[in-house]
Amino acid sequence: MPTPLAWGPFSVTPFTFDQVYFLVTLACYLPAVVLLWRSWVMKPFKQWAACLHEFSHALGAWVTCNSVTSIEVHGDEGGLTRWKGNNVECGRHAVLPAGYMGSCFWGCLIVFSCCDPIFMQVVALLLCVALLICLLYAFIGQTEEAPDRLPLIILSLSFTIVIGGVATVCFFLPWHPLLEALMLWLGALNIVYATLDIYDDTVARTDERSDAYQYAKLWGPCCFAKCVGAIWLTASVFVLLTVTGWTWTWLARSEGEVNWHALLPGPIVLSLAVLLRIGLGFVGAGAGEEKPLLPDGGKDKRGFDEAKATDFLRSKVMGNV
């Protein structure tokens, strides 16, 4: 049985060290991501989250026996997934919600993988496989403009090298704390991305180009986009809380060694995020600009919904191909 943490003769907590590490690190990462969400620091990470978002759309097409012709991630944090096939009607019901719910799934899977070092390495390599598939489509996909290929190429290569490199080294060296810190950061990133994106696109406002709006149209006039968004958001939050609870319960069985230095990444990242946010606030105040946490209805600047709605309309026109 795992023993509670203790400091000298005094009992510090009834929890295991792995539970404390998980709670402290995730509790620091989540607000850090939110604080920096609209800053330039998060741009590559948001593009990575967008990459998994588009890959999830592709998974929805493949699951319904359709084919994907291209996957794109743009420099403005937007993306586009083109697909076609003989099961277009069935595909729409899977492809449209796959982006939002896929981001939630990836975030939950990454966080839950931290329960076990081997499982964590497997999930890290699975992420690399997804990135390599996106890289393949960056070269062979039916992209209309050559510059659209470059962001996805750079993104896929960079994150594959970092994630795959650390995961591979962990098979030979005891670098598991580093990989766990990295995976929890990526998991927190996808959790925030999934939650804020669903809320902003579907609940906070109604955009005819959003996935929720197009999905609501599949069910007729009695279904509203905000209702679809509320259902997706509720399901996303429920799954996130459930998986977090599973992870906490699983870590209660662990007997990992106490290493207080492993707790440093979370507080350090949060401290840097606060300082950077304050610094960016001063710069923005000096320039007379204030950037909101969520975009002010400007999803066309990021291209997410426009791309997906174009995808939907394209498949509607194509019919059976």
PLM ranges: what are they?
Residues 2-29, 35, 78-251, 260-284, ...:
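Metalloprotease/metallohydrolase-associated module, dominated by Zn2+-dependent proteases
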Residues 46, 50-51, 99, 174, ...:
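Intrinsic structural disorder
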Residues 43-46, 84, 217, 226, ...:
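Context-gated lysine
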Residues 36-92:
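Small-residue-rich helix-interface/hinge motifs
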